[in-house]
């Protein structure tokens, strides 16, 4: 563990009070264990790992909101965490704080085959989503290399090999439920294909890397499952070719 930067003792003056309140809220789902912190202090990037002060595991939007209110009141940094597959360093808690692991919020909440969309929690993995909806004849098209969570894909504006045909996450998300830094819960967008009702807050949050709020629910667009899938490989002598 010598290569992992540990921010303890926490530079955040109110952390101890905040963690006491988080334990009262979540019981064993609020952890300061070193192994748990180590898992959540890194991603797949080259940036050096750094331990958070604590890790919490909410199971619904109301708990995320309560966590945010506690951390906001004590000025404790919050870092949303999904599959940990990011290669951009955004998950690393450089100032300590509380990592909010969203993986226990992994439900498919609703499917609307007639409208070609569904509503999911952020901790649901993309492959699991496609397994759950395969009987509808529809599929979720965005396919980054890793089996990322839908929340993580939204926060990073993910893309993949299917992007040239179907589009990126910016094209797939129709609406969001988001918990703001002070714990307020807002909804953006709608299931309508076209809407000019107010500011386009949905696309403000897509790709924001968790800096503007914590995504707790996503309405995503679906496509008819292709009847045939063909793969091909192209080889080139060098990069210039």
Spell out what each predicted region is.
Residues 80-84, 91, 102, 122, ...:
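Glycine-rich, histidine-containing beta strand-loop boundary motifs that form or position
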Residues 107-111, 120-241:
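FAD-binding subdomain of flavoenzyme oxidoreductases
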Residues 1-72, 85-116:
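N-terminal flexible segment immediately upstream of the FAD-binding catalytic core
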Residues 72-74, 81-83, 148, 172:
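Short, basic and Ser/Thr-rich N-terminal targeting/leader segments
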Residues 32-33, 81, 129, 143:
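Residue-level detector of family-conserved "landmark" positions at structurally sensitive sites
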Residues 35, 82-85, 145, 191:
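Short, ordered loop/turn segments at secondary-structure junctions
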Residues 76-77, 139:
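Residue-level detector of anion-binding/catalytic polar loops
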